[in-house]
Each structure stands twice: as structure tokens, then as C-alpha cells.
Design a protein with these regions (language model features):
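Gly/Ser/Thr-rich phosphate-binding loop
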Residues: 257-265, 274-345, 358, 365-371
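Flexible, low-complexity linker/hinge segments
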Residues: 1-4, 119, 139-170
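Conserved AMP-binding/adenylate-forming core of the ANL superfamily
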Residues: 21-67, 71-75, 92-97, 148-151
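Conserved adenylate-forming
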Residues: 49-54, 156-169, 173-215, 227, ...
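Conserved AMP-binding/adenylation subdomain of ANL enzymes
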Residues: 194-213, 221-261, 276-277
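AMP-binding/adenylate-forming catalytic core of the ANL superfamily
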Residues: 91, 97, 108-110, 263, ...
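Conserved ATP/PPi-binding loop(s) of AMP-dependent carboxylate-activating enzymes
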Residues: 352-356, 364-399, 434-436
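Structural core segment of the AMP-binding/adenylate-forming
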Residues: 8-10, 51-52, 79-151, 476-478
Length: 533
């Protein structure tokens, strides 16, 4: 028996056909239908792909928000033998052009409000022949060869048989950002996605169940929304999809109204949720957990949700290359006997490897670091569901060693094997030959009651080569300044760790997936310091 994505959808359609999928529409209303409907519409679409000149093996791009139509594409495309290529809609035009040309996509399925991107770049796309607008009708557009999604599937076959595909058939594709150069492509097979899904649903991983109501805020264009759409279909869990441009008030209103039990979002969204809940509390009594990722979650955020709302924040670690999960927080039986607030020092860490994951932390000489929570090394990891190469990219040579992916993430390991992410290798600050963790400084700054968000980067220094510079976003009405921030940090760190500069700013730049954009901060820090002098 081959491991196929079709098995995930067929299970929910057969055994939980009436379970709901809810989508927030652009006008704020809610669209509701069921797994029975999802299955029929995905088959309708699969039966119509050939009419667009799309055949097994072709790459097909999506450029869309988290909606029911995008959810249908998650199954219709790979189950028809094509490759679901989710494209980050927040990328610069030149990166979108590069990605679509490099992957040789045959068509693009795009939400109506995102059409302007393709109106600007259509002339540069070499292989895209058709644009399918995810709507009832085609809006006014200058694009050629455009069809409306509902027109396309109207005459499709709701009982179209999905193919029995070899499990190593490519099923999905994402591009991951690169430290330098253009994004790198990662291919997922049916086997990869199936194994990752089953692992994610395990009790000691995310514990996804049919009784759950899931809200993936993490975009469906980013690492398969951390696998949650596939996990929901596998277990038949109710899905709540937040639609276009979700922000904290909308997310929290959905959590309250739909009785969400588990949600997943970037840490920056979690910080925004805290601020919104302080402004206007909600009833979140249905929640059993909130997964935050993309960067280290501040302990203060975890404490807020636990103390004020009674549910924990889950942490994990992974990447696009890992499909994406590789580790997950684990609260062992001894720790479970203690009050939940005492779990936070473990929850702020990145957990232990998921079943099936092999992970090692190596020093600069390629030797395993001791499990003393002090020695720092780079994480190397491999799983049965992770990639071993980049798509048509020579950077594979530097990115993988003996089947292990070189993550570029620096970590220490506790005596019981729990990862503590110290920093990205490129984000560590080397001052006078000694390493300083930007993550530790950021977490301490965010624990100040008047600080909403913080980022620490290296600023050039004539004597020490690099010194920490802190960018700080304060809470509304805050009066805290550099002197008080330094005093807040002094008891927590050695003197030479303390930032030399504290810049109070209105906002910190983010990447397309909500992470702090430290590359941008490093590029602007010298100018910012000159202007603040």
C-alpha cells in the first residue's frame, strides 16, 4: 500500500463527512461547509485540470490566503498527480518571478485581491499559461487567459477517482528564504506529507483529534501551514480558516465564536494577541493550546496566556526543509506533577525530537556538544519526511551532509536532551571574541511590563568589532527609556552582554512569514545610530 495524500481526505470524507470547515470571507461573513463538500469539490477540480493543459508531474502555483478554496487545492492538485506549489504572497515581485520561473509552474491559482502582483509581472513569467481566480467570477483585469474557479469546477466530476500514486511522487513544493541569493526550492513527496501528518497528530506532538477545532493563522503558503491542513483532514477536525489579512482582533473573535481548541501562529501574532486581549478580553475557555513559532516565544507571553486564560503555549522547532516539524516541547511525567506555571522554563525551549527524527548538535569542529546546557553548536537534523536536497540548486552541496540538513541554528542541549535555541548562526553577536545571544537579550527585554517587542542585532564597533544594539517597541503610553531598560537587564546578564544602544521605535520590520527581519535591521543599524546620536 502506497502512502498517499488522498488517504487523509478520504478518511475525513468517509467517517466525519458532516464536520465543518469555516472560512472568514472578505466582507467579514462566514462560509461554512463540510468535509463531504470539500471532497466533492476537490474531485471536481482534479477532473478539470487537463482542460487547462495541466497534467501529472506539472507544478501548479497557489497565491492565496487561508480559505476553503485553498484547502481544496491542497488535495485536488497532489491527488491528481500534480505538484502543489504554495507561493509566499508577501515576497517582492522579483522573487515571485524567480520562483515561478525556476519551478516552471504551468498555472497560478490566485485570490482576487492579489491579482495586481501578476498584472505587474505576467510578462516576465516564462511557463505560466493560465491564471485561475479563486472566486465566482473574473474581476476586471489586464491578465490574459484568466478563468474563474467556480466556472472551472462547475462541470467537474464530484466522484472523480484520485490516482493511486507511488508514494515518492512529488506532491508539494515550497521555497525557503536564503541568507544570500534567491529563495531555495523544497519538494515534498506524498510519503513525506503523510508521515509528517501522522507524526504531528501523535499525543506527545500536537495531539490533533477529531474533537478539535483548529485555527491555522500561520499562512497556508508557509511550510504547508505547519502541516495543520493535512492533520485536520486526517483526523476530521473542524477547521476555521481566517481568510485574508487576519489580525489579532479578527483572530480572537473567531477563536471565541467558533470555540477553537487549538491555534497556530507566528510569535509576532501572539504578541499582538496579548495586546488585544489586554484591551478587550475574550472568552477563550475552549482553548487547550496555542502553538507559536518562527522565533523564540518570550516567557512573558506564555505566562499571560497561562495565568489569564488557562492554556499553555506550545513551542516546536523545524523548517521548510523538515516539512516542517522536527522537535516539539515535551512535559514529562515528573514535571506534570508540578503547577503549570513551573512548566514555562521547559516550554520556552524547543523540545525534543519528534518520533523518527534524528538530531545532533555539533561544535565548529564537527564534534557533538556535551549535554550541559552551556556548550553551543549547530543543529543537524534528518527525518523520514524531510528533504535531502534543494530543487535544481547547487546550494544543496553546502546545505546537507550525510543526509542531515545543516540548519544554521545554534543550540545548547540540557542534560535530559531538550534543545535550547540560542540564535541563528548569522544572528549571534561576536563581541571581543565572545558570543552573545540576541534571543536571550530579546526575551529579557520583552519581559519588561512596558515592552511589547524587541530585536537585538550586532552594531559595528571599532574596539570590539560588534556590540549589541536593541530595537524596542513599547506598549502604548509607556515611559520606559534606555536607562531603565539597561537597569532591567543588569541583574540578568554579564555586563559585557548588555546592549550599548537602545532604540525606541514604532515597529520592527518583519519577513513575509512574520519573523523579525534581522537582515534588514543589520543593514540599517549604522544609519539608525547616526540619526539617533
Amino acid at each position: 500500500m502506497e502512502l498517499n495524500i488522498r488517504l487523509l481526505l478520504e478518511r475525513s470524507a468517509k467517517y466525519f463527512p458532516g464536520n465543518e470547515i469555516v472560512t472568514r470571507l472578505p466582507d467579514g461573513s462566514l462560509h461554512r461547509y463540510t468535509y463531504r463538500d470539500l471532497d466533492a469539490r476537490a474531485r471536481r477540480l482534479a477532473s478539470r485540470l487537463a482542460s487547462l493543459g495541466i497534467h501529472p508531474g506539472d507544478r501548479v502555483a497557489t497565491f492565496a490566503w487561508n480559505t476553503y478554496r485553498h484547502f481544496e487545492l491542497y488535495f485536488a492538485l497532489p491527488c491528481a498527480g500534480t505538484v502543489l506549489h504554495t507561493v509566499n504572497l508577501r515576497l517582492a515581485d522579483e522573487h515571485v518571478v524567480y520562483i515561478l520561473n525556476h519551478s516552471e509552474d504551468r498555472a497560478v491559482f490566485v485570490d482576487p485581491d492579489l491579482l495586481p502582483t501578476f498584472e505587474r509581472i505576467a510578462g516576465e513569467l516564462k511557463t505560466v499559461k493560465t491564471f485561475v481566480v479563486l472566486a465566482d467570477r473574473v474581476p476586471p483585469t489586464t491578465l490574459p487567459n484568466v478563468v474563474a474557479y467556480e466556472d472551472l469546477i462547475r462541470d467537474g466530476d464530484p466522484e472523480f477517482p484520485f490516482q493511486e500514486l507511488p508514494e515518492r511522487t512529488p506532491a508539494g513544493m515550497c521555497y525557503t528564504s536564503a541568507t544570500t541569493g534567491m529563495p531555495k526550492g523544497v519538494i515534498y513527496t506524498h510519503r513525506d506529507i503523510y508521515l509528517h501528518t501522522i507524526t504531528e497528530c501523535l499525543g506527545d506532538v500536537l495531539d490533533i483529534r477529531e474533537r478539535d477545532t483548529l485555527l491555522p493563522v500561520v499562512p497556508m503558503f508557509h511550510a504547508n501551514a505547519w502541516g495543520l491542513p493535512f492533520a485536520a483532514a486526517c483526523m476530521g477536525a473542524k477547521m476555521v480558516l481566517p481568510g485574508e489579512r487576519p489580525h489579532a482582533p479578527v483572530i480572537l473573535d473567531l477563536m471565541q465564536a467558533e470555540r477553537v481548541t487549538f491555534a497556530a501562529a507566528a510569535v509576532s501574532i501572539g504578541i499582538d494577541m496579548v495586546a488585544e486581549l489586554k484591551r478587550q478580553p475574550r472568552d477563550l475557555s475552549s482553548m487547550r493550546g496555542l502553538m507559536l513559532g518562527g522565533s523564540a516565544t518570550p516567557a512573558a507571553v506564555m505566562e499571560f496566556f497561562l495565568k489569564d486564560y488557562g492554556f499553555p503555549v506550545l513551542t516546536a522547532w523545524g523548517s521548510t526543509e523538515m516539512t516542517p516539524l522536527a522537535t516539539c516541547v515535551h512535559i514529562g511525567r515528573e514535571l506534570l506533577q508540578k503547577p503549570a506555571i513551573e512548566h514555562i522554563p521547559t516550554r520556552v525551549r524547543q523540545g525534543i525530537p519528534c518520533p523518527g527524527t534524528e538530531l545532533k548538535v555539533l561544535d565548529e569542529h564537527g564534534r557533538p556538544v556535551p549535554w550541559d546546557d552551556q556548550a553551543i553548536g549547530e543543529i543537524y537534523v534528518r527525518t523520514p519526511w524531510s528533504t535531502t536536497e534543494y530543487y535544481r540548486d547547487e546550494r544543496t552541496r553546502d546545505g546537507f551532509v550525510d543526509g542531515y540538513w545543516k540548519s544554521g541554528d545554534m543550540s545548547a542541549v540540557s542534560p535530559d536532551g531538550v534543545l535550547r535555541l540560542v540564535d541563528r548562526a548569522k544572528d549571534l553577536i561576536k563581541s571581543g571574541g565572545e558570543w552573545i545571544s540576541s534571543v536571550d537579550l530579546e526575551n529579557a527585554l520583552v519581559s519588561h511590563p512596558q515592552v511589547r517587542e524587541a530585536a537585538v542585532v550586532a552594531a559595528p564597533d571599532d574596539k570590539w568589532l560588534e556590540r549589541p544594539c536593541a530595537y524596542v517597541v513599547t506598549e502604548p503610553g509607556a515611559t520606559v527609556g534606555p536607562a531603565e531598560l539597561r537597569a532591567w537587564l543588569e541583574p540578568k546578564f554579564a555586563k559585557w552582554w548588555l546592549p550599548d544602544h537602545y532604540l525606541i521605535v514604532d515597529a520592527i520590520p518583519k519577513t513575509g512569514v512574520g519573523k523579525i527581519n534581522k537582515r534588514a535591521l543589520r543593514e540599517q543599524v549604522e544609519q539608525d545610530l547616526r540619526q539617533s546620536a
